[in-house]
């Protein structure tokens, strides 16, 4: 079983971290915009695993609840 198949066992809304592509599907924000947002040094909803960006889903939810625009 590969990593993608394992990730499909747990729904996105229950995972602690999600990929950029999953975050884009989850929020409706494009991958490019999410990448731009996570490039900021003050971004607290990104977690780096080597050179891979993982999105902290709960922190992203909090950010979006308080954001006026992205």
Question: Model-flagged regions — what are they?
Answer:
Residues 1-4, 65-70:
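Short intrinsically disordered terminal tails
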Residues 4-5, 41:
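Generic extreme N-terminus detector
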Residues 6-33:
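Polyanion-binding surface elements
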Residues 25-54, 61-62, 67-68:
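Major-groove DNA-recognition helix of helix-turn-helix-type DNA-binding domains
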